[in-house]
């Protein structure tokens, strides 16, 4: 689900400060800014070019006045054959990150409306990007997700889907990764789930007054939430570090309440939600001056089900949460005061994030081997970035994987793809491989040792420029039944292990002990 933000220059949501603040820990990327572009500042945040974090795509400048700088450029991906287009960003392995993608179409391609496409994070299909309604209203769109890094390289990808028009190209305006402290959302098992932001609100905050960095040290954006309930100003400041999620103190400055003895009803968010499990955190603070009498007790229910009982709210603030709470359709929060409590319930802020099951994991050794293979190719396919197997349907071109406890690479087929470079020795670490078909390319160097590929059934390396000898270990692979090596520059004798076997070997006259003398098998 998208969240709307009017990013016009006179309505910058992030406060402008007289003194600069250091950026949050992570990356703020201005997509499509170009290799020589200087950093740009939005509020007091500094965004740098995305060059060096992605190797594919074209750039475009939006011809519209008074845009915030990060919306004035974008990167788009016209290559229809690529299964995905990925950013690769160095991170702390196992670290927890808030990922935000921002989109502003700006009619960059001359089309009638923005394209619709998928976004993928760490191999999991995260959501569909559909900015049509927002753009029609003059708005940009952003999406957020909290996910942990599987390795030292983090991937965020875009991909076409069946709603992407034939003349449309996925695009992106800005990409942000903010490193989160361990305590934040720590009741979620991030080895199994991610948290996709649905809504994050500060109740009673004036329209347009969005809370972000530096009030929120992680640059989470707290949208204003107004309704018909009375607004009160809180007279004491909370300490963010007293809360596991470290909400900004400013999110508690205003609250909504009701009269003594009455229930407080809040319909939030304003749109219906799909049936799913959600992480819900609600934040409260008594708005009066600190004293022994500044407290209030009430029960909280969501859609008629008890959420928390006897919530005792003081001027120090309080949060109640549920890590996996079922929601469907319209959501209503009802706060019912306890007997004899002299003041009505109050609520300051809230977060709802959808619990998103992760789409599995490719064996890390396979990922490392495939990345090394890619680095040894001079011109790998444009979608050879991110997870080689995941999500299913968006694996690397020419790569087929098998599902198990981990996804494993079982076929590598780049026949006639025009690949140059060499075969990395790490191909031997792809121990689940059944088929290697790399014929009809421009590969140089030697055939690496493949003695560990016990599942290998066919090896096609014909019509390349490979040199050296044929590894004798090929004859000891128990399942190998087909070897095509013709039309290379190989030398030496055919290994004894490959003579008098039932393996179908295609060599022609290119295996020579001397340049002029072919070897008889």
Where are the language model's segments positioned?
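Leucine-rich repeat
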Residues: 406-407, 428-433, 450-456, 475-480, ...
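Tandem repeat domain/solenoid detector
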Residues: 432, 444, 455, 465-467, ...
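Leucine-rich solenoid repeat scaffolds
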Residues: 471-521
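Compositionally biased, intrinsically disordered or flexible polar/acidic segments
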Residues: 1-386, 392-400, 408-411, 415-417, ...
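The feature encodes a structural signal of leucine-rich repeats
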Residues: 423-425, 444-450, 467-472, 491-496
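Generic structural signal for short, solvent-exposed loop/turn connectors between secondary structure elements
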Residues: 315-318, 331, 445-453, 500-512
């Amino acid at each position: 689900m998208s969240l709307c933000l009017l990013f016009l220059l006179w309505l910058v949501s992030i406060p402008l400060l007289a003194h600069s603040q250091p950026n949050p820990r992570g990356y703020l990327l201005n997509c499509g800014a170009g290799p020589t572009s200087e950093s740009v500042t939005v509020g007091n945040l500094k965004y740098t070019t995305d060059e060096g974090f992605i190797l594919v795509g074209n750039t475009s400048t939006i011809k519209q006045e008074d845009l915030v700088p990060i919306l004035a450029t974008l990167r788009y991906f016209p290559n229809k054959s690529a299964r995905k287009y990925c950013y690769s960003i160095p991170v702390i392995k196992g670290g927890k990150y808030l990922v935000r993608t921002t989109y502003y179409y700006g009619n960059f391609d001359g089309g009638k409306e923005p394209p619709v496409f998928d976004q993928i994070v760490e191999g999991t299909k995260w959501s569909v990007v559909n900015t049509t309604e927002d753009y029609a209203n003059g708005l940009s769109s952003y999406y957020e997700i909290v996910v942990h890094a599987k390795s030292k390289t983090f991937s965020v990808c875009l991909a076409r889907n069946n709603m992407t028009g034939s003349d449309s190209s996925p695009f992106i305006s800005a990409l942000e990764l903010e490193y989160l402290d361990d305590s934040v959302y720590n009741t979620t098992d991030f080895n199994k789930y991610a948290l996709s932001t649905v809504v994050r609100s500060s109740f009673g905050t004036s329209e347009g007054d969005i809370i972000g960095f530096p009030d929120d040290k992680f640059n989470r954006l707290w949208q204003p939430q107004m309704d018909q309930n009375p607004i009160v100003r809180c007279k004491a400041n909370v300490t963010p570090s007293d809360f596991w999620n470290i909400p900004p103190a400013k999110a508690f400055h205003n609250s909504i309440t009701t009269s003594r003895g009455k229930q407080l009803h809040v319909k939030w968010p304003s749109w219906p939600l799909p049936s799913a499990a959600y992480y819900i955190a609600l934040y409260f603070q008594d708005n009066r001056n600190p004293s022994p009498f500044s407290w209030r007790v009430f029960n909280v229910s969501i859609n008629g089900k008890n959420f928390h009982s006897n919530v005792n709210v003081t001027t120090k603030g309080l949060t109640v949460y549920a890590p996996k709470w079922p929601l469907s359709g319209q959501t209503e929060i009802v706060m019912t005061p306890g007997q004899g409590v002299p003041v009505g319930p109050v609520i300051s802020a809230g977060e709802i994030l959808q619990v998103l099951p992760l789409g599995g994991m490719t064996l890390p050794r396979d990922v490392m081997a495939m990345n090394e293979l890619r680095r040894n190719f001079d011109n790998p396919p444009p979608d050879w970035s991110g997870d080689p197997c995941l999500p299913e349907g968006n694996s690397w071109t020419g790569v087929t994987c098998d599902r198990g406890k981990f996804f494993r690479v079982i076929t590598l087929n780049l026949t006639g793809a025009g690949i140059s470079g060499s075969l990395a020795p790490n191909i031997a670490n792809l121990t689940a491989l059944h088929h290697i078909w790399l014929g009809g390319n421009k590969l140089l160097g030697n055939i690496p040792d493949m003695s560990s590929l016990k599942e290998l059934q066919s090896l096609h390396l014909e019509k390349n420029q490979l040199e050296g000898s044929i590894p004798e270990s090929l004859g000891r692979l128990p399942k190998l039944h087909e070897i095509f090596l013709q039309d290379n520059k190989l030398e030496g004798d055919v290994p004894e292990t490959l003579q008098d076997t039932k393996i179908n070997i295609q060599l022609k006259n290119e295996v020579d002990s001397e340049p002029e003398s072919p070897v008889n098998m």
